[in-house]
Amino acid sequence: MPDKHAFLSPSSAERWYNCPPSAWLCEQFPDLGSVFAAEGTEAHSLCEYLLGVYLGRKDLTDPRPGLQYYNEEMEECCQGYVQYVTEIIEGFRKAGESPAVYVEQRVDLRRFIPESMGTSDCVIVGGDQIVIVDFKYGMHPVPATSLQLRIYALAACELFSALYDFESVRMVVYQPRIVNVDESSMSVNDLYAWAEQDLHPRAQSALTGKGDYCVGSWCRNCRARRQ
């Protein structure tokens, strides 16, 4: 289940990547949260439970009795997510692979983004490919090329490259409430080149408060904008 966001969190990457000084500016204002964020957190906890049950885990507690925003729509969305993930898993198996599956996997982003950690919804490794699936319960469209997902893909490669021999990264956004399922792929080498040449320098600028303010679509969730 997602936990407290890091200073340079993947979820806010679109903002601090494009407008580095906004990272420290937003620290001056409280994060008041929202009903939408609370709904998303609860939906993620249900996804984690349902997918864990499918994978045969016996140590899980059904979160539904304690979910404030649980309803039929949330159940259908989370069940759909599990079905989609299982289809990816079965696809690997039909190809003769034995995929490894990691649910709500804690990842370390600090090599490229100082002081940053995160949690990836689902990581699947099979053959020469690693797949990162990002569940979105919100209504704002999110593409598979989002910085958040690319950063989680990078972190997954960092974590699992010593265990598995994969060459390509497949990034998937599953956003059921607006019927958005989007995919993007790239080579591991290209992902690391982007991280070293682009992501890391921008993260350093954000951490030190350098760079220029820049207005764009990433201002939508900026805390400073709301003041």
Question: Can you annotate each of these PLM segments?
Answer:
Residues C19-A23, Q204-Q227:
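Cysteine-cluster motifs in flexible loop/terminal segments that predominantly coordinate metals
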Residues E42-S45, L147-A155:
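Short amphipathic alpha-helical face segments that pack within enzyme cores
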